[in-house]
């Protein structure tokens, strides 16, 4: 899977090691979910002002959030999360607020790398149609996220 990662914020330094970690965790998520072939995902790191604007525009919430996902294809309730159609497939865009991730990493007592990786996996699963609107959906997403992160050595 091809990952395009863009840092569009200047509040916090994001070095090559962190970018490599994000690519690695997205590749692990793709492998765990059976995403193969020429699939593509875009991950953009932004500041709170940028994500607040997106959140207001697309969700009607006038506040910053940690992660937003914009899937190119919406999944119905009975559709599989991912079905490889063969050929190129742009899954969608993941947008993460780095300042919010920094705050959350402090609150949860883990590294920024771990928090950004968690948010990237969370956003990726949303692109595949996973959601946490129900207790069962939330439990499934949580289990998948933790398994993927543990698989790349990013435990809580």
UniProtKB/Swiss-Prot annotation:
Which PROSITE patterns does this one have?
UPF0054
What does the UniProt keyword field contain?
Cytoplasm, Endonuclease, Hydrolase, Metal-binding, Nuclease, Ribosome biogenesis, rRNA processing, Zinc
Q: Which GO terms describe its molecular function?
A: metalloendopeptidase activity; RNA endonuclease activity; zinc ion binding
Q: Example GO biological process term?
A: rRNA processing
What's the Enzyme Commission number for this chain?
Answer: 3.1.-.-
- Binding of Zn(2+) occurs at 122, 126, 132
- SUPFAM superfamilies per the UniProt record, alphabetical: Metalloproteases ('zincins'), catalytic domain (SSF55486)
- Supply the PANTHER family for this chain: ENDORIBONUCLEASE YBEY, CHLOROPLASTIC
Family as reported in the entry's similarity comment:
Belongs to the endoribonuclease YbeY family.
Q: How is this protein named in the record? A: Endoribonuclease YbeY
- Give the source species: Moorella thermoacetica (strain ATCC 39073 / JCM 9320)
